[in-house]
Amino acid sequence: MNDKNRISEQYTATQGKIISYLVQGLTAGKQYFKSKYIAKDLGLSPKEVGTNMAILSGICDELDISRWSYSNSTTWRVLPRSA
């Protein structure tokens, strides 16, 4: 099964959008993401992003997501999980 099908079956549509966004960022060399910028880029509210990132930090097998900082919007550290 390819990654897109697995993501669409395992996560909500919003969570799938966020995961795809994070994977693209990781590919570009980023590992820190602010909720407000994710929200702006994906057309979501920062609260919606924060809620889903907190959920994903506990259930996402592909990415290691941790809350990193709270100053001027929550910053999340995202790393690929070891296989």
Regions found by a protein language model. Give the residues of each.
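Short, cationic-aromatic polyanion-contact patches
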Residues: 65-83
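C-terminal flanking helix
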Residues: 57-64
